[in-house]
A protein has these predicted regions:
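Generic detector of short, locally flexible boundary/turn motifs and exposed helical patches
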Residues: 8-13, 46-53, 78, 103-106, ...
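Extended, charged alpha/beta regions that create polyanion-binding interfaces
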Residues: 1-76
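Short, acidic Gly/Pro/Ser/Thr-rich loop/turn segments
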Residues: 9-10, 52-53, 90-91, 193-195
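Structural signal for hydrophobic packing residues in well-ordered secondary-structure cores
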Residues: 42-48, 104, 108, 132, ...
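Phosphate-binding glycine-rich loops and their immediate beta-loop-alpha structural context
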Residues: 51-136
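Conserved active-site and cofactor/substrate-binding residues in soluble primary-metabolism enzymes
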Residues: 33-39, 78, 95, 99, ...
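Short glycine/threonine-rich loop/turn motifs
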Residues: 88, 95, 112-200
């Protein structure tokens, strides 16, 4: 078994891995899906010799087919994060904090600050501009369903830019990505409040 040596995301050369499996039906290489998030010691892949023994030349051919870097773990590059929550009267409040913090902790990213502001562009823009961490996460009181909604507008007002609006995942398609200087900004979808697997 190939185990993760730390947290990260699995990156693979699918053609190389398929070539390994094509060498001989007695050699099987099974992996987690591409871009699977892994924790330390999580099983990334398993290699089996079904017949228990094979000629050395067959094993060497499988190794050659894999080449270098066919399967690797991309470690987190961000160290710390700020979570900004927008709120409305009777809203969810900080209900998603624990789920977001759990995801960050699994990647060895420290949640340094949690800020709650009214669900309006101006106070949100101030909070975004004041954040000093590598990553700024925005969890809004209502779904960000338009490029000119509260959170994307606030990011632009703070001097940042929206680099991607919407994601082809479900749940989680109301996510947006942005940048403010060197800081990455992610507008989280409402499903981020749940600890269940989703696009967040």
């Amino acid at each position: 078994n190939l185990l993760a040596d730390g947290p990260g995301v699995v990156v693979m050369d699918r053609a190389a891995l398929e070539a390994v499996n094509a060498v001989d039906p007695m050699i099987t290489l099974a992996t987690v899906p591409p871009y699977q998030q892994m924790g330390e010691s999580g099983m990334v892949a398993t290699i089996k010799i079904i017949s228990y023994a094979l000629p050395e030349s067959t094993v060497e051919a499988a190794c050659a087919a894999a080449g270098e870097g066919a399967l690797r773990l991309a470690p987190p590059v961000l160290r710390d994060a700020t979570l900004i929550i927008t709120d409305v009267p009777g809203g969810a409040g900080d209900k998603g904090r624990a789920a977001v913090e759990g995801r960050l902790t699994a990647l060895n990213v420290t949640l340094c600050d949690v800020v709650t502001v009214p669900h309006r562009s101006a106070p949100l823009a101030e909070a975004i501009a004041a954040a000093e961490t590598d990553l700024v996460l925005i969890l809004t009181a209502s779904a960000t369903s338009d490029i000119n909604d509260v959170a994307p507008s606030a990011l632009r007002a703070a001097g940042g830019e929206v680099t991607r609006f919407g994601m082809p995942v479900d749940p989680g398609n109301l996510l947006f990505l942005g940048q403010l200087g060197t800081r990455a900004v992610i507008g989280l979808p409402g499903c981020a409040r749940s600890p269940a697997l989703n696009g967040a």
